A protein has these predicted regions:
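Extracytoplasmic c-type cytochrome modules immediately beyond a signal peptide or single-pass transmembrane anchor
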Residues: 1-7
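Residue-level detector of functional hotspots within protein domains
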Residues: 4, 47, 60, 83, ...
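Rieske [2Fe-2S] iron-sulfur-binding domain
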Residues: 8-110, 117-122
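C-terminal catalytic domain of Rieske-type non-heme iron oxygenases
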Residues: 40, 98-99, 103-105, 109-236
Length: 236
């Protein structure tokens, strides 16, 4: 599952919180720039350790002041020294993270292998997707099946019918072309007509053809994105 972009937490101690399948998550950049995703739950009485986003030197539980480092290690548990409690043996559960093209992905399955999408990597490489920076973010919760988002986003067939005065003029149904697909992903090109200018110049390695289209991809089950020359939009 895609949680966001690496540049949301550029500095050591930057963090944001998220929820995945009723699991409260804490996404933090720690020492040496390492990005971790941990359980956002104190090991003592289950209180949330953080809310929203920000920057902090330590995560301190608001209930009993148990204190954790950026790596999830318990640093302090007040008045527990006489209870036979091993502070060094306690830490926040950590989930498996993979960074790809500037995105942060997490899985709750520790045995899930890292994904590899060489054909999709080759498709996005000229755009330098990993170098894009977040300029706007909006949060909504949709009570729907994940396939509704993916199936609607990943086809241009409906554009002429549903969006005749907006998207169809920029990315006509008739110019949509299927691109690469593989295990866990698919993609297509929304090509612009000759009358439409590219969306910015973009990276120096882009061809004229790549500047004249939006490259859309889906990483199943929960992420869809549109990459243009100077614009990247992602939903997850």
């Amino acid at each position: 599952h895609c949680l966001g972009r690496e540049d949301e937490i550029p500095e050591m101690g930057d963090f944001f919180t998220a929820q995945l399948l009723n699991e409260p998550l804490l996404v933090v950049r720690g020492e040496e720039g390492i990005v971790r995703v941990m359980a956002n739950v104190c090991r003592h009485r289950g209180m949330p350790l953080a809310e929203g986003r920000g920057n902090t030197k330590r995560f301190v539980c608001s209930y009993h002041a148990w204190t954790y480092g950026h790596d999830g290690a318990l640093l302090r548990a007040p008045r527990m020294q006489n209870a036979g409690f091993d502070v060094k043996g306690c830490r926040l559960p950590e989930h498996k993270v993979q960074l790809w093209n500037g995105f942060i992905y997490v899985t709750l399955d520790p045995d899930e292998p890292d994904f590899e999408h060489p054909e999709l990597d080759a498709l996005l490489s000229p755009y330098e997707t990993g170098s894009f920076r977040l300029v706007h973010m909006a949060e909504e919760e949709w009570h729907t099946n994940w396939k509704c988002l993916v199936e609607n986003f990943m086809e241009g067939y409906h554009l002429s019918v549903v969006h005749p005065r907006t998207l169809h003029g920029y990315t006509p149904t008739g110019l949509s072309r299927k691109l690469v697909n593989g295990d866990g992903y698919t993609s297509y090109a929304a090509n612009y007509p000759d009358s439409i200018e590219p969306r910015g110049h973009g990276a120096s390695g882009l061809s004229d053809e790549e500047r004249k289209r939006s490259t859309l991809f889906a990483k199943f089950p929960t992420q869809v994105a549109s990459q243009a020359a100077s614009l990247l939009v992602s939903l997850s």
